[in-house]
């Protein structure tokens, strides 16, 4: 824990984005107690593993699925190791934003990280393939692909950057919700001021669809929707409730246009110094935690849908998704990135072969 002291202090003072979907503590909510851990063993467990404590972090608040996931992961690991492996759980921006905490994990200040996959792409561009629009029709497809050999192929190169890939979790399919008009077809977004994350890939999509994308950090979103700077947002269903960004929302359209992942990774030096038996438990339970995140997103989306409907939001559960795909030109849309350093045609073809 000594190595965390300075980072905890810095994280407590920093104003940063929340994890994996950029969640922040909702109004009226209370911050969960960060720094929780499963009970540590004082003697070797029945499997002969020496007691060990590792730090795990996800920047989101207690309502975010990534934070729920690392809490469950800590439980699973402790149980599978007969109490020998303790994961010291931190969350709620305590150790910084996605970008800050990923860098801290690369440096070894944090042992294990579960953060938005997009946060890794600033230095690991190969993962940008997962930010392509309409790559997956559902979260179920994303799970099958990213937790297969293809997922290992996408993320194996992380070791060159001081990280070891463990599993890929879920943070939801992105949809569109608006303050001023229903959206059923691609034609309905013409000129629409839609807030998107500060990512060129997101900007490209909405510009191609004829909307007016506005790149804003998440903490600016609620105010932007209130004052008209933005008229729409693209987020997973549960994010609107977890982030309290639905007060001005009147319409919600389930277009499933982009999937958001969360990546579980370990500091490479920490990982390489672990007993192989510990590595096996961490890897296997990371896969179980990834599945937990997908299942929990599904449940939280259902709950959030009811909350939004009770607040008067009108849902279009069957929009004309094909009109959006057609407006982008189908899979040919991806060709514009062929000259980008991160573009890998063979990898993209492997993904498409699984989902088309």
Predicted regions and their residues:
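Sec-dependent N-terminal signal peptides of Gram-positive bacterial secreted proteins and lipoproteins
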Residues: 2-23
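Short stretches within intrinsically disordered, low-complexity N-terminal or propeptide regions
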Residues: 7, 12, 34-36, 42-43, ...
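Bacterial lipoprotein signal-peptidase II cleavage site
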Residues: 18-39
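N-terminal secretory/targeting leader peptides
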Residues: 21-28, 44-140, 150, 158-356
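Conserved glycine-rich "GG(E/T)P / GGGxP" loop and the immediately following alpha-helix
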Residues: 155
């Amino acid at each position: 824990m000594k190595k965390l002291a300075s980072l905890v202090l810095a994280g407590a003072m920093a104003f940063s984005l929340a994890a994996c979907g950029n969640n922040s503590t909702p109004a009226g909510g209370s911050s969960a107690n960060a720094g929780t851990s499963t009970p540590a063993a004082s003697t070797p467990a029945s499997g002969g593993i020496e007691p060990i404590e590792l730090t795990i972090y996800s920047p989101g608040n207690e309502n975010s699925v990534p934070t729920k996931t690392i809490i469950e992961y800590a439980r699973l690991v402790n149980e599978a190791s007969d109490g020998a492996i303790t994961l010291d759980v931190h969350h709620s921006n305590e150790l910084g934003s996605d970008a800050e905490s990923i860098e801290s994990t690369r440096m070894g200040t944090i042992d294990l990280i579960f953060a938005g996959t997009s946060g890794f792409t600033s230095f690991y561009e190969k993962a940008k393939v997962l930010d392509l629009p309409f790559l997956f029709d559902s979260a179920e497809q994303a799970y099958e692909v990213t937790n297969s050999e293809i997922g290992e192929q996408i993320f194996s190169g992380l070791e060159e950057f001081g990280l070891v890939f463990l599993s890929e979790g879920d943070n939801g399919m992105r949809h569109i919700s608006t303050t001023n008009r229903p959206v059923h077809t691609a034609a309905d977004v013409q000129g629409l001021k839609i807030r998107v994350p500060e990512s060129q890939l997101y900007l490209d999509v909405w510009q191609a669809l004829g909307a007016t994308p506005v790149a804003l950090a998440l903490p600016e979103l609620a105010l932007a929707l209130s004052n008209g700077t933005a008229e729409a947002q693209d987020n997973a269903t549960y994010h609107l409730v977890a982030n309290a960004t639905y007060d001005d929302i009147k319409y919600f359209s389930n277009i499933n246009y982009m999937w958001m992942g969360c990546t579980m990774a370990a500091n490479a030096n920490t990982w390489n110094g672990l007993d192989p038996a510990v590595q096996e438990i961490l890897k296997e339970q990371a896969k179980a935690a990834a599945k937990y995140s997908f299942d929990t997103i599904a449940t939280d989306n259902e709950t959030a849908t009811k909350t939004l409907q009770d607040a008067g939001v009108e849902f279009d559960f069957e929009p004309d998704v094909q009109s959006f795909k057609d407006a982008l030109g189908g899979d040919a849309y991806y060709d514009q990135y062929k000259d980008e350093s991160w573009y890998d045609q063979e990898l993209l073809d492997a993904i498409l072969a699984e989902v088309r």
